[in-house]
Amino acid sequence: AGDGAGGNGGLASLTAGSSNNGAGGAFAAAAGSSTGNGAGGAATINAGDSSNSAGGAVSIGAGDTTAGGAGGALTLSSGTSTAGGNGGDVALTSGRGTAAGTDGGHSTVTAGRGAQLGGNVQVFGGVGDANTGGHVSVVSGAGTSTSSGSITIKTPDAGDAGISGALVFSSGTTSSGSSGSLSIGSGHAVGGKGGAITVTVGDGNVGTAGAISITAGKSTNTDGGA
């Protein structure tokens, strides 16, 4: 599209055809493959920069449906390697705010709302066929001159007739080795107080208040856990 010296730049639009009875037209853009020693071609989608206002946005959306079917799926997938290399990475990173007083951009992953059940959010580490499976790490941001960020894991309140969601922390089971450990620890302090650990059960207005149960593991071949 054309540049605009004193106004807006020109619009570039690529649209597949609509259909009244059949499937709408498809739109495909593919970078070139390489059958030799070179890398396959890259595909880049960039929104426009702005020197005086906000940069342009990039929106990728799947289609809606009104006829009882599922909405279109959106899949982001990195490439597979079959010749000794690692699989491709997928990185989702929000923008940095470099000027004084500005914040970094937020990254939000939200499952869809449903008239019956809400959608799930699932995060899995990769399976390791010959070695350890992939790790899942949730790390808050560091503060270079002030406090680091917090991590909050919480289920929301229930409606009038429901039960609030449960929180389950569990390590894995093993058939031939030791099962995974579960550790909860607060941070050390060099010049101040060490962090506290608080375990609190809920009050009960009508029924019994919540209990705390700590049970050591059983063993069939040696002493039970302490």
Predicted regions and their residues:
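Surface-exposed, glycine- and small/polar-enriched segments that build interaction surfaces at terminal
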Residues: A1-A226
